[in-house]
Amino acid sequence: MRKRISAIIMTLFMVLVSCNSGGVAEDPKTVYLTSIANLGKGFLDVFVTFGDMVTGAFGIKADTKKSDIGKYFTDIEKTMTSVKKKLQDEVVKNGNYAKVKTVVAKFIEEVLDKIAAGAKEAAKGATGSDAIGNAVHNQDAVAADATSVNALVKGIGEIVEVVLKDGEGDAGATKTGDTEKKSIGKLFAKKDDDRAQEAEASAANASIGAVSGADILKAIAKSGEIADNNKNIEEAKDAASIAAAKQTDDKKEIKDEAAKKDAVIAAGIALRAMAKGGKFTAKQNEEKSANAVNGAAASAVGKTLSTLIIAIRNTVDSGLKTINEALATVKQEDKSVEATNTAEATTSGQQAKN
């Protein structure tokens, strides 16, 4: 896309040079071409700014803090707001062409504003200085804060609605066996005999690897709001209730058929890892089991967020391409009435002074 815009700018620049040769005074056509060239450059700058943000490395590791995830969402919100302001400024500075103005306004309202709002909401749910992979042998699992889980589900859901099409991702996607899926409940158990070992962590990784990031995002978006975190893992019915499942003696399996889906399990692990207070458990006196569980948590979060940012980037790229296409079709006579009237008023005022 950057090459396409650059080509347009270069072509316009060459036209401008030819129009200005010989010291001829600027005519309306030259002013028009200059305005369009400036507008095109402004949109290119917007694209570069956004590209710099999304190509930056964001390596999710087991020791990544929950607050780092919150900052990630806050940065998405700030970037959308920045792109919005730059687009608005370029339209105002370089000529109010109705075609471009309409496309920009639609893009801002239907894409940028909605992504920004979703990211702002999601950031409320990812707080705390503890790590996303925070299972420690000899320590119990802890249910994620219900309000935080709801904020993540709502915010991510709002973004998903904009950046993923109907056919992208399946909230019910599943491939692994029932026995393996049921055993993942041990990541949320209480008694030591019920706590996760490497086998259960491996099963969790299998569920995460069996589905796409889009599947996980759709499972998060499909989750209902939870009232509290007082239900155990065997009562969990969706990703949100898996994330908020409390640890209870002898409750160690994911049993509900709706929850026993790879996409839902992966989404629940990702939400619990990101949400305030959420913690997994591992076999007592087995550090290797804790490391395996934490690796699974990091994998779920990484897959979820990398897919989300790629989807956001593609959606914004598509919107900027639409603006670029509108820019390529505008003609001098397309300039909006308000811009024309402003120019005429300025000319009349100067003549009156003379």
UniProtKB/Swiss-Prot annotation:
Q: Where is the lipid attached (N-palmitoyl cysteine)?
A: 19
The record's InterPro entries line, in alphabetical order, gives:
Borrelia_lipo
The yes or no answer to whether the keyword Lipoprotein is present is: yes
GO terms for cellular component: cell outer membrane
* Residues with lipid group (S-diacylglycerol cysteine): 19
Disulfide pairs here are none
Keywords noted in UniProt: Cell outer membrane, Lipoprotein, Membrane, Palmitate, Plasmid, Signal
Main location as per UniProt: membrane
State the superkingdom: Bacteria
Q: Where in the cell is it found?
A: Cell outer membrane
Q: Where is the composition biased (Polar residues)?
A: 338-354
The record's Pfam families line, in alphabetical order, gives: Lipoprotein_2
Quick one: signal sequence residues?
Answer: 1-18
- Family recorded in the similarity comment: Belongs to the variable large protein (Vlp) family. Delta subfamily.
Instruction: Tell me what else is known.
Output: Genes for both Vlp and Vsp families are on (usually) unnamed linear plasmids in B.hermsii HS1.
| Protein's job | The Vlp and Vsp proteins are antigenically distinct proteins, only one vlp or vsp gene is transcriptionally active at any one time. Switching between these genes is a mechanism of host immune response evasion.
Specify the protein name: Variable large protein 15/16
Which organism does this sequence originate in?
A: Borrelia hermsii
